[in-house]
Structure formats: C-alpha cells, structure tokens
C-alpha cells in the first residue's frame, strides 16, 4: 500500500511539474528520463499516469509527449499498411549520413540513446498497435517507411505490342 501511495504521489507531482513548468521540466528531462522509464516498465499504474508526461527528444533538441510527436509525424511517416513509423537514432554524430538522408526525405527523427530505450521501445510498441519504431540505419532510406508507389509505364501502347512477344516467348 505504501509503495502504491508513494508511486501515485510521485506521478502526480511530475504531472504537476510538467503541466505548470514545462520548460523547466524539459531542462531536467535528461536526468529524469531513466527513472520515469524504469517506473513505466516496472509499474503498470505508474505507466498509465506517466504516459502524459513522458517526453521524447528529437534530434533537433525539441521535446514532445508521445501523443504530440505521433500527431506531428503521422502524415509523412505512415507506411502502406497504416503503421505510423517512428524513426530513431542512438548515435546522432556516428550515424550522421543516415540521419541526413532521412531528413532530406522530410522525416523527423527521435534521439533514443538511453540505457532503457530499447526496453521502452518494446513496451511502447506492445501497448500501441499501429506504431512501429525503426532505427534510421536499419535499411536504406527508401525502405525505412514503405509507401505504396506505383511505377508509371513509360511505353506507349504501340511499344507495348512490339515488346509483348519478346516477353511471352521467354
């Protein structure tokens, strides 16, 4: 009972800090992150409350809640199956070429380089069906978010008739 009470009070206080002093909360986020992630991974009741003040950091240094970030990237980072793809990098400097290629395509990238981030990613994907995290260096930039693209036919109908026997004879 005592641990549940303490957990609830901590979550309420963090929510209050987030709501009333967001810039100060963001400034302290890098120090708070591991404790909040650990709490979310180990205590379901804390996780329910913490989802409102858990922040994600983009490579530009801006902080977002999960809802804010997903709403921001939903239009450009949804694949052909309807999954919202959240791109992330664990080493911005070391994987700069991958980051720049993704940014050139108009994609937004999260910086997830903490000790518990891989566990948090699995947790978040298990709780949200239509969300997938993809590391920015896991594939070529064109395959990170698979869009349904149709190849335009560049042959005229006359050229198609000429080519048809060639392919049918194979």
PLM regions: where:
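Conserved GHKL (Bergerat-fold) ATPase module
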Residues: 1-170
